[in-house]
A protein has these predicted regions:
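Short coil/turn segments at secondary-structure boundaries
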Residues: 72, 87-91, 128-130
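Intracellular loop-helix junctions on the cytosolic face of multi-pass helical membrane proteins
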Residues: 1-73, 77-83, 113, 117-123
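Short, solvent-exposed coil/turn linker segments
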Residues: 11, 71, 93-94, 159
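Helix-boundary and loop/linker segments of multi-pass membrane transporters
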Residues: 42-48, 88, 92, 153-157
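Short extramembrane helix-to-coil loop segments that connect adjacent transmembrane helices in Major
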Residues: 77-96
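Membrane-embedded alpha-helical bundles of multi-pass transporters/translocases
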Residues: 50-64, 95-186, 190-199
C-alpha cells in the first residue's frame, strides 16, 4: 500500500475499487458463515437461501436509489432550469432544493401505501413480487431521466418536472422494498443471527 502511495498509483479510482471489492466480499463471507454454522437448523438454512436473492435485489435497489444524492444532484445543478415563472415573476431556487423532494414523497406515499396494504389484506402481492415491482420502479425512474437528453439534447437546461417525476417514481419503489425488506429479514433470519442480519 505504501509502495502504491509513493509511486502515485494510489488514487481515488483505486480507493473506490478497493471498497467495491470489500463491499462484495463481506456479504459473501457472512452468508457463507451463517450457512455453514452449526447453530442453525435445516429449515433456517433453507430460509437463508431464500433470502439471498431478496438481499441482492435490495442491494441493487439501494444502489439506484442512492444515486439521487449524487447523480441527480449534479443533474439538478448542471442541466435543470432553477427558476419558475409565477404571475410574471421569476422565482429562483437552489439545486439543493431537490434533495428535499425524496422525504416529501415519502411523507405523501406512506399513508397511501398503508391504506392500500390494509385494503388489500391477504390479496396483496407477495414479498418477492413487491421487491420485483420496486426494482422495476427504480429502473423506470432512471429510464425516465434518459428522456430529457433524448428529447432536448444535453446542452439544454430542462424543466424541474423531469427530476420531480424521477423521484416520484423511485420512491414508489422504496415504499415497496424498504418496509418489506425489513419484514422479510426478520421472518427469514435464523434466531442465532437475527440481529446481525437485520443490521
Amino acid at each position: 500500500l505504501l509502495g502504491l502511495v509513493f509511486t502515485h498509483q494510489f488514487n481515488v479510482d483505486m480507493i473506490v475499487n478497493i471498497f467495491t471489492v470489500i463491499a462484495v466480499i463481506i456479504p459473501i463471507y457472512y452468508f457463507f458463515k451463517i450457512l455453514s454454522s452449526q447453530k442453525i437448523t435445516a429449515t433456517e438454512r433453507s430460509r437463508v437461501f431464500a433470502y439471498i436473492p431478496l438481499f441482492i435485489a435490495g442491494v441493487l435497489f439501494w444502489s439506484i436509489e442512492e444515486q439521487g444524492s449524487v447523480v441527480l444532484a449534479l443533474f439538478a445543478d448542471d442541466q435543470t432550469r432553477l427558476y419558475f415563472n409565477v404571475f410574471g415573476n421569476q422565482i429562483h431556487f437552489p439545486s439543493s432544493f431537490f434533495q428535499s423532494i425524496n422525504p416529501l414523497f415519502i411523507m405523501i406515499y406512506v399513508p397511501i401505501f398503508a391504506w392500500l396494504w390494509g385494503k388489500m389484506g391477504k390479496k396483496q402481492p407477495s414479498s418477492a413480487k413487491k421487491f420485483a415491482y420496486g426494482l422495476f420502479a427504480a429502473g423506470l425512474s432512471f429510464l425516465w431521466m434518459m428522456l430529457p437528453g433524448m428529447l432536448f439534447g444535453t446542452d439544454v437546461k430542462v424543466s424541474p418536472f423531469w427530476l420531480i417525476m424521477s423521484w416520484a417514481i423511485v420512491i414508489v419503489g422504496e415504499m415497496l422494498i424498504s418496509p418489506i425488506g425489513l419484514s422479510v429479514t426478520t421472518k427469514l433470519a435464523p434466531k442465532s443471527f437475527q440481529a446481525q442480519m437485520m443490521s
